[in-house]
């Protein structure tokens, strides 16, 4: 069950583009009344031309979540926005705790009510033929004061997103660049760093490389890979994702489809 769980988290990522329609992860908000989603993407909706909200329906019952973005201003060719998210992971964590199939946390552990808060500043501008976005954020994990350090899930992508509940707070820094290649094809690369000051597992880095084929202003297909590095309780470790799975040929990439209407 571990690797399917990772794949879901991998694909639950943010892929940026150079228009307000494909604006997830940038400082741009969706136009008013616009919807956007994907196979493994949250559903986003434009409240007005400078505000949107996002909810991941796949996790809505087990991991209630909501993200709000506000585009504030333009300054020196940069578009500036703030993004604020709230997460309640306790139902999901308790559902994978215990003995038996689909359980990945030992049954002696129990997770209390945990609330995650994210607050980020996003800055986006055009550079050369592409678009660059920088981001910096504060992560807060509430309710984790009594968590047993042995209850961590020490696997890529999952651990750095849960570490904030064990450490209480953290920082997230990153940047993304997307640019046209030829015709309908464009390329995307990003880098994200998670820092948890005071923790023995304090540093995590993730980068994603994607090829994007845009069918129209309503549909696009993305394929690529993600690379991770982290300081886990068991030691430093790097990983290419997705990994080789018994049901897939070696080297199979991440695949996602986005639609908007």
Which residues does each predicted region cover?
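Residues that define the transmembrane beta-barrel architecture of outer-membrane proteins
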Residues: 35-39, 60-64, 78, 111-119, ...
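Residues on the lipid-exposed face of transmembrane beta-strands in outer-membrane beta-barrel proteins
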Residues: 41-45, 66-70, 117-125, 138-140, ...
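Predominantly the C-terminal beta-signal and adjacent terminal strand-loop region
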Residues: 198-261
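Detector for outer-membrane/organellar transmembrane beta-barrel domains
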Residues: 112-197
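Outer-membrane beta-barrel biogenesis signature
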Residues: 15-36, 246-252, 258
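Outer-membrane beta-barrel channels and translocator barrels
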Residues: 48-50, 73-75, 127-130, 178-184, ...
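Outer-membrane beta-barrel translocator domains and adjoining extracellular loop/strand segments
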Residues: 68-69, 93-101, 145-153, 199-206, ...
């Amino acid at each position: 069950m571990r690797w399917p769980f990772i794949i879901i988290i991998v694909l639950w990522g943010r892929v940026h583009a150079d228009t307000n329609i494909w604006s997830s992860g940038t400082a741009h908000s969706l136009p008013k009344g616009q919807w956007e989603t994907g196979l493994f993407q949250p559903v986003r909706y434009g409240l007005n031309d400078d505000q949107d909200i996002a909810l991941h329906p796949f996790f809505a019952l087990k991991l209630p979540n909501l993200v709000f973005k506000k585009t504030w201003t333009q300054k020196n060719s940069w578009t500036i926005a703030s993004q604020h998210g709230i997460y309640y992971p306790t139902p999901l964590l308790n559902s994978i705790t215990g003995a038996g199939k689909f359980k990945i946390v030992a049954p002696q552990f129990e997770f209390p009510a945990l609330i995650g808060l994210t607050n980020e500043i996003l800055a986006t501008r055009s550079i050369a033929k592409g678009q660059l976005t920088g981001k910096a954020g504060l992560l807060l994990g509430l309710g984790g004061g009594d968590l047993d350090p042995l209850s961590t899930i020490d696997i890529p992508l999952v651990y750095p997103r849960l570490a904030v509940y064990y450490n209480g707070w953290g920082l997230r820094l990153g940047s993304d660049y997307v640019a046209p290649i030829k015709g309908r094809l464009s390329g995307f690369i990003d880098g994200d760093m998670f820092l948890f000051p005071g923790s023995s597992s304090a540093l995590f880095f993730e980068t994603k490389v994607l090829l994007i084929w845009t069918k129209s202003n309503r549909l696009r297909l993305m394929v690529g890979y993600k690379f991770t590095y982290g300081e886990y309780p068991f030691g430093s470790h790097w990983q290419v994702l997705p990994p080789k799975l018994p049901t897939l040929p070696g080297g199979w990439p991440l695949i996602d489809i986005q639609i908007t209407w």
